[in-house]
Amino acid sequence: MPRVLFGQAHAYNNYYTASDNNYAIGVGVFASMLVENNYFRDVRNPHQFMYPDRRPAYITATGNIYDNTSGDMDTGAVTPDGYDSVEPFTNPPYTYDLDDAEDIPFLVTRYAGPTVNEEKDITAPGAPVIIAPAESAVKF
């Protein structure tokens, strides 16, 4: 599960499911994170500030689904005394397509991981693209 320190990060179109976790996304120490269109199922602390009383951080969360979650779903800024605030990260410097959050469990469990030998008649947004037939793949 991602933890961000000293930078900007973007988590989108992810499926988080782990009933024994401490957190799904942790943001701390001069970090700013954009959390978009993810599906959180059976997790504690879907997104949380890691050191809210010691260092500034920022979380922007939008379009996510929280299914049987508990704990922190922190958003906004945390700025302890004596520190400047961290700017929100809301405009990644690249283009991307957001899937509907309710479709994420299906898309991730169906299209993530080793799928090179499977026949597909549809291409999901963000699905891996096969550029060579499986027969010609290098085998180790």
Predicted features and spans:
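Extracellular beta-rich repeat passengers
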Residues: 3-6, 10-140
